[in-house]
Amino acid sequence: MQEGKISQIIGPVVDVDFPEGRLPSILDALTVTRADGTKLVLETQQHLGEERVRTVAMESTDGLVRGMNVTHTGKPIQVPVGLEVLGRMLNVVGDPIDGRGPVNTKKSYSIHRLAPRFDEISTKAEMFETGIKVIDLLEPYSRGGKTGLFGGAGVGKTVLIMELINNIAKQQSGFSVFAGVGERTREGNDLWHEMMESGVIDKTALVFGQMNEPPGARQRVALTGLSIAEYFRDEEGRDVLLFIDNIFRFTQAGSEVSALLGRMPSAVGYQPTLATEMGELQDRIVSTKKGSVTSVQAIYVPADDLTDPAPATAFAHLDATTVLSRSIAELGIYPAVDPLDSTSRILDPNIVGDDHYDTAQAVKQLLQRYKDLQDIIAILGMDELSDEDKLVVSRARKVQRFLSQPFFVAEAFTGLAGKYVKLEETIKGFKEIIAGRHDNLPESAFYLVGTIEEAVEKAKTL
């Protein structure tokens, strides 16, 4: 165990002096024991000459002073992995933060691991059902694939992620890993209590590095969650779900660290290594022949600008994109998914079947035609449309409302019981609306219901 001494502290960046020729390797973990006996973990980022390293702290550097002893652990940050972490809440370095005693696992993994080799990766395309109509029909998620939830502030990314955790954990009884990256601590607290109440917690491991943490923790916490998920995939042979909320904060923390380390900023002030950092994280989220990791990542879009380098870099890695739109949220349609902007690589008749594909395309064509007619309606009004176009508008508005549905996790806000809709029910409902079988029902009958039968029943009460 090599000992060094702190020579400089600038916020979350700490410089440490070591004897010449004994410098720790880049990414190695160092530990400092504070006066109150607590340990602080530092991660080596740069070598400054022969005797000094620059490190980034994983927790607040309050209480550190120059001259304090630093111990070199000889390896990168290690986190506990195994079945014992299920039902627990950890921080970036794998310490429990739920007040329920230590996590005793037989194994620990480094947070920095190589991506699986090409010959180990599985490329099988298969849809997995979420029970959310708009997603299953128009941008189906693939098992072992990566999905991004794009949206600006307050359009419902976190609620949608929480609904997915709820549906998948209950319906498919798989293991989930949730990484809270730089988001609100209150939301993490709500999620924890909701999971405890619903009984889902026993199949979930939670890792948090929230908004109040220094940038080092926010930059690394996604890797901690990923290492836990990799253990379940590689050693337990499981199909794991990895939820990351929010991947933008990973990039944002990387940008802060980059500036603190004195690197020249790149476009829009982001770090020059943006694409590399994102690639190193995303390349590890893959399915192998042993098991799969299906990931759902919330991606905050700064100022609703999808061309910003942070969301644009993430786009390249995804199999499906769910774009949440403020204009749809303003109509009161939740989940506020934009059906024309969202995409999926597996919406292909060879994978999902002709029936599903044809229904999805018909829905998109109907909504696109309605969008094209909206300018005419705004200027001339509905009366100037042909009878055929009036019918298109009427059906499109019903489809638009039928794409909404009540969520289990939002029962407290809506006062409506949550609904899980099976894929065949979803396809059947939209086919009937497009075929004109429900032209006589009012639009409001289709709003916030599950199946088409519920819409018919609701119409009787209106």
Swiss-Prot record:
It catalyses: ATP + H2O + 4 H(+)(in) = ADP + phosphate + 5 H(+)(out). Pfam families: ATP-synt_ab, ATP-synt_ab_N, ATP-synt_VA_C. GO terms for molecular function: ATP binding; ATP hydrolysis activity; proton-transporting ATP synthase activity, rotational mechanism. GO terms for cellular component: plasma membrane; proton-transporting ATP synthase complex. Its main location: membrane. Keywords: ATP synthesis, ATP-binding, Cell inner membrane, Cell membrane, CF(1), Hydrogen ion transport, Ion transport, Membrane, Nucleotide-binding, Translocase, Transport. Its EC number is 7.1.2.2. The keyword Nucleotide-binding applies. Transmembrane segments: none annotated. It is found in: Cell inner membrane. It is a peripheral membrane protein. SUPFAM superfamilies: C-terminal domain of alpha and beta subunits of F1 ATP synthase (SSF47917), N-terminal domain of alpha and beta subunits of F1 ATP synthase (SSF50615), P-loop containing nucleoside triphosphate hydrolases (SSF52540). It is an enzyme of class 7 (translocase). InterPro entries: AAA+_ATPase, ATP-synt_VA_C, ATP_synth_F1_bsu, ATPase_a/bsu_AS, ATPase_alpha/beta_chains, ATPase_F1/V1/A1_a/bsu_N, ATPase_F1/V1/A1_a/bsu_N_sf, ATPase_F1/V1/A1_a/bsu_nucl-bd. ATP binds at residues 151-158. Produces ATP from ADP in the presence of a proton gradient across the membrane. The catalytic sites are hosted primarily by the beta subunits. Belongs to the ATPase alpha/beta chains family. F-type ATPases have 2 components, CF(1) - the catalytic core - and CF(0) - the membrane proton channel. CF(1) has five subunits: alpha(3), beta(3), gamma(1), delta(1), epsilon(1). CF(0) has four main subunits: a(1), b(1), b'(1) and c(9-12). PANTHER family: ATP SYNTHASE, ATP SYNTHASE SUBUNIT BETA, MITOCHONDRIAL. This is ATP synthase subunit beta. The lineage of its organism: Bacteria, Pseudomonadati, Chlorobiota, Chlorobiia, Chlorobiales.
